[in-house]
Amino acid sequence: MKLWLILGAISGFISVALGAFAAHGLQARVGPAEIAAFETGARYQMYHALALFAVAWVAAQGGGSLASLAGWAFVAGTILFSGSLYYLGITGSRALVLITPIGGVSFLIGWASLAVGAYALRLPGSGG
């Protein structure tokens, strides 16, 4: 559980820092399309930084391997999806564009794993 809290906090921090860089440091270097791609990467990184807090909660409630799968899928998705968009935004190069959808699939695996893991929990007063 502690790992997911730490990774979520670090990822959120990086997302805010990179979002600020996009807003204040990229305009002179690249065009609007590259800035938009970079901002999309930062936005999705923040979404999944917050998702890691949900992973920590499910793990703390006994979500076990499904929570871990979700967490690692979110981390992989952030590296692949957001990372490839950061690269595009900074360099203007589309060399890593084929990695972006792999990161998106990692995000989907994470959300599905989190949903199944949460569904399987036995919480007091939940009737299941």
Give short role names for the model-derived ranges.
Residues 1-128:
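Polytopic transmembrane helical bundles with strong interfacial aromatic enrichment
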